[in-house]
Each structure stands twice: as structure tokens, then as C-alpha cells.
């Protein structure tokens, strides 16, 4: 009886492992198709940003940046800022758009996540509004590197100082 129970438990564990492996393969194929479709459109993938249960691509072509389904015209970008917990720590302003005297640095309301972790974001200010690229609060170095990569690419594109 004990051997039968052990065999059933082993079979259940094998079925669970096979299910997890199949799900992981499907997820990898879906991500691969997404990357391939971005490249087929002539876009360069800058970063894969974790969002919820999936990854959002931040990509670029000659005239635009793409954050998920949103497109951001490079010519309309006025400034880019790195935010940590909603407060700006680095900024670059486009020389195409002179800074207005009443313009204040971008900041967003801090959302406490329950655990003391820093949340890294990049705010891309355009003529039409601000796009917040949420790089996350996974682990400090991971989110920080994602934010730094996005910031540097956008800063280089707008010719900020």
C-alpha cells in the first residue's frame, strides 16, 4: 500500500513538472515571436521590462521609441528623467525645446509597496504629455540597470546634456 501511494505521488510530481516545462516553453516561444516581430519592423530592442506576469519591450527605430503599444516621437521629446521612488535623480533636456521658467521637474506620487524597495522609473516628457516607463522594484540592481539603459538611449536621441 505504501509503495502504491509513493508511486502515485511520484506520478503526480512528474505530471506537475511536465506541465511547468510545457508552460515555460510556450512562454519562451511567445517572447521569441514578440522579439522577432519587433526586429521585422526594423526596431532595435533596448530593454525587456517586467510588468506584471509578462515583459514589455522598450524598442526604437529611426524616428520613434516604442514602450509596449505606445509610440513616442523622438522629435517631440522635451526632457527625460530618471525617477527613484517618484523623485527625479537625473535629467536631460532637449536643446530643441527651450526650458520654460515655470517648468518643474517631473515627479510622481510615491506608492509604498509594503517592503522597503526602491522603485525605478523613467519619465519621458513630450510636447503632448509625459510617458512613464516603469522599470520596477524587482531587485535594486536589475531595475536600476533597466532605468539607466532606457534613460541613456533616450538622452542620446534627444541630444540632452
Predicted feature residues:
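Generic detection of short hydrophobic beta-strand segments and adjacent strand-loop junctions
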Residues: 47-49, 72, 131-135
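Acidic-enriched, low-complexity/disordered segments with a strong bias for Aspartate over Glutamate
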Residues: 3, 36, 53-54, 61, ...
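Sequence-level detector for tyrosine residue identity
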Residues: 27, 66-67, 97, 151
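Glycine-centered tight beta-turn/hairpin loop motif at sheet-sheet or coil-to-beta transitions
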Residues: 53, 69, 127-130
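Acidic, Ser/Thr- and proline-rich intrinsically disordered linker/docking segments
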Residues: 80-161
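Extracytoplasmic/periplasmic/luminal assembly and interaction segments
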Residues: 57-86
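Anionic N-terminal interaction surfaces
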Residues: 2-64
